[in-house]
Protein backbone atom coordinates (compact mmCIF):
# COMPACT_ATOMS: atom_id res chain seq x y z
CA UNK A 1 0.00 0.00 0.00
CA UNK A 2 1.29 3.45 -0.93
CA UNK A 3 1.83 6.08 1.78
CA UNK A 4 -1.04 8.54 2.32
CA UNK A 5 1.01 11.53 1.10
CA UNK A 6 1.77 9.74 -2.17
CA UNK A 7 -1.88 8.74 -2.65
CA UNK A 8 -2.86 12.38 -2.17
CA UNK A 9 -0.57 13.42 -5.04
CA UNK A 10 -2.02 10.69 -7.26
CA UNK A 11 -5.55 11.92 -6.53
CA UNK A 12 -4.48 15.46 -7.36
CA UNK A 13 -3.09 14.24 -10.69
CA UNK A 14 -6.26 12.29 -11.51
CA UNK A 15 -8.51 15.25 -10.76
CA UNK A 16 -6.45 17.96 -12.49
CA UNK A 17 -8.36 19.63 -15.34
CA UNK A 18 -6.31 22.72 -16.23
CA UNK A 19 -2.62 21.91 -16.28
CA UNK A 20 -1.15 19.43 -18.73
CA UNK A 21 1.57 16.86 -19.32
CA UNK A 22 4.47 18.92 -17.94
CA UNK A 23 2.70 19.51 -14.64
CA UNK A 24 1.60 15.87 -14.47
CA UNK A 25 5.17 14.64 -14.92
CA UNK A 26 6.50 17.01 -12.27
CA UNK A 27 3.85 15.91 -9.77
CA UNK A 28 4.64 12.29 -10.58
CA UNK A 29 8.33 12.91 -9.91
CA UNK A 30 7.42 14.56 -6.61
CA UNK A 31 5.44 11.42 -5.74
CA UNK A 32 8.57 9.31 -6.23
CA UNK A 33 10.55 11.68 -4.00
CA UNK A 34 7.91 11.36 -1.28
CA UNK A 35 7.89 7.59 -1.71
CA UNK A 36 11.65 7.45 -1.13
CA UNK A 37 11.21 9.45 2.06
CA UNK A 38 8.18 7.55 3.40
CA UNK A 39 9.21 3.93 2.77
CA UNK A 40 12.21 2.05 4.13
CA UNK A 41 14.54 -0.17 2.11
CA UNK A 42 12.51 -3.32 2.77
CA UNK A 43 9.38 -2.03 1.02
CA UNK A 44 10.73 0.55 -1.45
CA UNK A 45 11.02 -1.71 -4.51
CA UNK A 46 7.43 -2.90 -4.12
CA UNK A 47 6.30 0.70 -3.62
CA UNK A 48 8.07 1.85 -6.80
CA UNK A 49 6.39 -0.88 -8.85
CA UNK A 50 2.97 0.06 -7.45
CA UNK A 51 3.52 3.79 -7.98
CA UNK A 52 4.64 3.25 -11.57
CA UNK A 53 1.48 1.24 -12.24
CA UNK A 54 -0.75 3.90 -10.67
CA UNK A 55 0.92 6.72 -12.62
CA UNK A 56 0.65 4.91 -15.95
CA UNK A 57 -3.04 4.15 -15.36
CA UNK A 58 -3.84 7.87 -15.05
CA UNK A 59 -3.33 8.26 -18.79
CA UNK A 60 -1.81 5.21 -20.55
CA UNK A 61 -0.89 7.23 -23.65
CA UNK A 62 0.70 10.26 -21.94
CA UNK A 63 4.38 10.11 -22.87
CA UNK A 64 5.58 12.29 -20.00
CA UNK A 65 4.22 9.82 -17.45
CA UNK A 66 5.58 6.83 -19.37
CA UNK A 67 9.05 8.36 -19.66
CA UNK A 68 9.03 9.35 -15.99
CA UNK A 69 8.17 5.78 -15.01
CA UNK A 70 11.00 4.47 -17.20
CA UNK A 71 13.43 7.02 -15.75
CA UNK A 72 12.98 5.84 -12.16
CA UNK A 73 14.83 2.57 -11.41
CA UNK A 74 13.34 -0.23 -9.34
CA UNK A 75 15.72 -0.32 -6.40
CA UNK A 76 15.74 -0.39 -2.61
CA UNK A 77 18.18 2.54 -2.54
CA UNK A 78 16.15 5.52 -1.32
CA UNK A 79 18.82 8.06 -2.28
CA UNK A 80 19.01 6.79 -5.86
CA UNK A 81 15.24 7.12 -6.30
CA UNK A 82 15.22 10.63 -4.87
CA UNK A 83 18.16 11.78 -7.00
CA UNK A 84 16.65 10.36 -10.20
CA UNK A 85 13.30 12.04 -9.57
CA UNK A 86 15.02 15.35 -8.80
CA UNK A 87 17.09 14.98 -11.97
CA UNK A 88 13.92 14.47 -14.01
CA UNK A 89 12.41 17.67 -12.62
CA UNK A 90 15.64 19.59 -13.26
CA UNK A 91 15.89 18.40 -16.87
CA UNK A 92 12.22 19.23 -17.48
CA UNK A 93 12.67 22.78 -16.19
CA UNK A 94 15.80 23.29 -18.29
CA UNK A 95 14.02 21.93 -21.37
CA UNK A 96 11.15 24.37 -20.97
CA UNK A 97 13.54 27.33 -20.70
CA UNK A 98 15.30 26.26 -23.89
CA UNK A 99 12.00 25.79 -25.72
CA UNK A 100 10.93 29.27 -24.63
CA UNK A 101 14.10 30.76 -26.08
CA UNK A 102 13.85 28.84 -29.37
CA UNK A 103 10.12 29.37 -29.79
CA UNK A 104 10.32 33.11 -29.08
CA UNK A 105 12.53 33.48 -32.15
CA UNK A 106 9.56 32.51 -34.35
CA UNK A 107 7.57 35.52 -33.15
CA UNK A 108 7.87 38.99 -34.70
CA UNK A 109 6.35 42.26 -33.59
CA UNK A 110 2.95 42.66 -35.20
CA UNK A 111 2.21 38.92 -35.22
CA UNK A 112 -1.19 37.54 -34.34
CA UNK A 113 -0.71 34.17 -32.66
CA UNK A 114 -3.52 31.68 -32.19
CA UNK A 115 -3.47 28.87 -29.63
CA UNK A 116 -5.79 26.38 -27.98
CA UNK A 117 -6.02 25.05 -24.42
CA UNK A 118 -3.32 25.75 -21.82
CA UNK A 119 0.31 24.81 -22.36
CA UNK A 120 3.03 25.90 -19.97
CA UNK A 121 5.56 25.62 -22.82
CA UNK A 122 3.48 27.91 -25.04
CA UNK A 123 3.05 30.37 -22.18
CA UNK A 124 6.82 30.48 -21.63
CA UNK A 125 7.41 31.09 -25.35
CA UNK A 126 4.96 34.00 -25.41
CA UNK A 127 6.29 35.43 -22.15
CA UNK A 128 9.87 35.25 -23.40
CA UNK A 129 8.97 36.95 -26.70
CA UNK A 130 7.21 39.75 -24.82
CA UNK A 131 10.14 40.26 -22.48
CA UNK A 132 12.40 40.54 -25.53
CA UNK A 133 10.40 43.59 -26.54
CA UNK A 134 8.13 42.07 -29.17
CA UNK A 135 4.58 43.37 -29.47
CA UNK A 136 1.93 40.91 -30.63
CA UNK A 137 -1.61 39.70 -29.99
CA UNK A 138 -2.77 36.25 -28.94
CA UNK A 139 -6.09 34.74 -30.02
CA UNK A 140 -7.02 31.89 -27.72
CA UNK A 141 -10.00 29.65 -27.19
CA UNK A 142 -11.85 29.44 -23.91
CA UNK A 143 -11.21 25.67 -24.21
CA UNK A 144 -14.45 24.15 -22.97
CA UNK A 145 -15.54 22.27 -20.97
CA UNK A 146 -12.83 23.01 -18.39
CA UNK A 147 -12.04 26.48 -19.75
CA UNK A 148 -8.29 26.29 -19.26
CA UNK A 149 -7.95 28.88 -22.02
CA UNK A 150 -9.22 31.46 -19.54
CA UNK A 151 -6.40 30.44 -17.19
CA UNK A 152 -3.90 31.10 -19.98
CA UNK A 153 -5.58 34.41 -20.84
CA UNK A 154 -5.15 35.65 -17.27
CA UNK A 155 -1.49 34.59 -17.22
CA UNK A 156 -0.82 36.42 -20.51
CA UNK A 157 -2.63 39.55 -19.36
CA UNK A 158 -0.44 39.56 -16.26
CA UNK A 159 2.50 39.80 -18.69
CA UNK A 160 0.81 42.74 -20.49
CA UNK A 161 0.20 40.62 -23.59
CA UNK A 162 -2.89 41.54 -25.63
CA UNK A 163 -5.38 38.68 -25.81
CA UNK A 164 -8.62 37.97 -27.64
CA UNK A 165 -10.71 35.10 -26.28
CA UNK A 166 -12.99 33.15 -28.62
CA UNK A 167 -15.35 30.21 -28.23
CA UNK A 168 -14.00 26.88 -29.45
CA UNK A 169 -16.57 26.84 -32.26
CA UNK A 170 -14.91 29.90 -33.84
CA UNK A 171 -11.49 28.27 -34.37
CA UNK A 172 -11.98 28.06 -38.13
CA UNK A 173 -13.31 31.59 -38.34
CA UNK A 174 -10.39 33.21 -36.52
CA UNK A 175 -7.51 31.01 -37.75
CA UNK A 176 -7.31 33.00 -40.98
CA UNK A 177 -6.66 36.18 -38.96
CA UNK A 178 -3.52 34.70 -37.39
CA UNK A 179 0.04 34.85 -38.68
CA UNK A 180 1.27 31.99 -36.50
CA UNK A 181 -0.19 29.12 -34.44
CA UNK A 182 1.55 27.51 -31.48
CA UNK A 183 0.05 24.78 -29.30
CA UNK A 184 1.40 22.39 -26.69
CA UNK A 185 1.37 18.60 -26.69
CA UNK A 186 0.56 15.84 -24.26
CA UNK A 187 2.27 13.24 -26.42
CA UNK A 188 4.16 12.97 -29.70
CA UNK A 189 3.71 9.42 -30.95
CA UNK A 190 6.35 7.15 -32.46
CA UNK A 191 5.06 8.01 -35.96
CA UNK A 192 5.12 11.76 -35.29
CA UNK A 193 1.47 12.50 -34.60
CA UNK A 194 0.57 14.98 -31.87
CA UNK A 195 -1.88 14.15 -29.09
CA UNK A 196 -3.28 17.26 -27.43
CA UNK A 197 -6.50 18.81 -26.12
CA UNK A 198 -9.48 18.04 -28.36
CA UNK A 199 -9.83 20.89 -30.82
CA UNK A 200 -6.12 20.98 -31.68
CA UNK A 201 -6.75 18.92 -34.83
CA UNK A 202 -9.46 21.35 -35.95
CA UNK A 203 -7.14 24.30 -35.40
CA UNK A 204 -4.37 22.56 -37.36
CA UNK A 205 -6.70 21.93 -40.31
CA UNK A 206 -7.95 25.52 -40.23
CA UNK A 207 -4.40 26.87 -40.21
CA UNK A 208 -3.41 24.51 -43.02
CA UNK A 209 -6.27 25.77 -45.19
CA UNK A 210 -5.37 29.40 -44.41
CA UNK A 211 -1.60 28.82 -44.89
CA UNK A 212 -0.87 29.82 -41.29
CA UNK A 213 2.29 28.13 -39.92
CA UNK A 214 1.25 25.65 -37.20
CA UNK A 215 3.87 24.76 -34.58
CA UNK A 216 3.82 22.42 -31.59
CA UNK A 217 5.90 23.05 -28.45
CA UNK A 218 6.97 19.81 -26.75
CA UNK A 219 9.84 18.77 -24.52
CA UNK A 220 11.51 15.57 -25.72
CA UNK A 221 10.20 13.66 -22.69
CA UNK A 222 6.77 14.03 -24.30
CA UNK A 223 7.91 11.85 -27.21
CA UNK A 224 6.65 8.28 -26.85
CA UNK A 225 9.02 5.69 -28.30
CA UNK A 226 6.57 2.79 -28.00
CA UNK A 227 3.09 3.77 -29.20
CA UNK A 228 1.94 4.88 -32.65
CA UNK A 229 -1.01 7.13 -33.42
CA UNK A 230 -3.22 4.07 -33.95
CA UNK A 231 -2.41 2.76 -30.46
CA UNK A 232 -3.27 5.92 -28.53
CA UNK A 233 -5.97 5.52 -25.89
CA UNK A 234 -8.01 8.72 -25.94
CA UNK A 235 -9.29 9.46 -22.44
CA UNK A 236 -12.96 10.41 -22.07
CA UNK A 237 -14.37 12.08 -18.97
CA UNK A 238 -18.08 12.00 -17.97
CA UNK A 239 -19.95 15.20 -18.82
CA UNK A 240 -23.63 16.05 -18.44
CA UNK A 241 -25.53 19.14 -19.55
CA UNK A 242 -29.12 19.66 -18.37
CA UNK A 243 -29.50 15.97 -17.63
CA UNK A 244 -28.12 14.74 -20.95
CA UNK A 245 -24.82 12.94 -21.43
CA UNK A 246 -22.37 14.81 -23.64
CA UNK A 247 -19.43 13.03 -25.25
CA UNK A 248 -16.24 14.47 -23.78
CA UNK A 249 -13.12 12.91 -25.30
CA UNK A 250 -10.30 14.99 -23.85
CA UNK A 251 -7.73 14.64 -26.63
CA UNK A 252 -7.44 14.40 -30.39
CA UNK A 253 -4.62 13.45 -32.75
CA UNK A 254 -3.03 15.78 -35.30
CA UNK A 255 -1.11 14.26 -38.26
CA UNK A 256 2.37 15.44 -39.25
CA UNK A 257 1.17 16.90 -42.54
CA UNK A 258 -0.55 19.81 -40.79
CA UNK A 259 2.46 20.67 -38.61
CA UNK A 260 5.20 23.10 -39.71
CA UNK A 261 7.52 21.97 -36.93
CA UNK A 262 7.82 20.73 -33.35
CA UNK A 263 9.72 23.07 -31.03
CA UNK A 264 11.88 21.04 -28.64
CA UNK A 265 14.77 21.89 -26.34
CA UNK A 266 17.08 20.39 -28.99
CA UNK A 267 15.76 22.58 -31.79
CA UNK A 268 12.82 22.56 -34.20
CA UNK A 269 11.98 19.18 -35.69
CA UNK A 270 10.67 19.47 -39.24
CA UNK A 271 8.24 17.05 -40.93
CA UNK A 272 9.53 14.57 -43.54
CA UNK A 273 10.05 16.26 -46.91
CA UNK A 274 7.22 14.35 -48.59
CA UNK A 275 4.75 15.89 -46.12
CA UNK A 276 5.75 19.51 -46.71
From Swiss-Prot:
InterPro entries on file: eIF2B_alpha/beta/delta, IF-2B-related, IF_2B-like_C, M1Pi_N, NagB/RpiA_transferase-like
Q: Keyword Protein biosynthesis: yes or no? A: yes
The protein's GO terms of the molecular function aspect are: guanyl-nucleotide exchange factor activity; translation initiation factor activity
Quote the Pfam families the UniProt record gives.
IF-2B
Keyword check for Protein biosynthesis, yes or no: yes
Q: Which UniProt keywords apply?
A: Initiation factor, Protein biosynthesis
Lineage top rank: taxon: Archaea
Family designation: Belongs to the eIF-2B alpha/beta/delta subunits family.
Summarizing the function annotation, the protein's role is: Catalyzes the exchange of initiation factor 2-bound GDP for GTP.
Task: Indicate the quaternary assembly.
Answer: Complex of two different subunits.
Q: What is this protein called?
A: Putative translation initiation factor eIF-2B subunit 2-like
Q: Which organism is it from?
A: Pyrococcus furiosus (strain ATCC 43587 / DSM 3638 / JCM 8422 / Vc1)
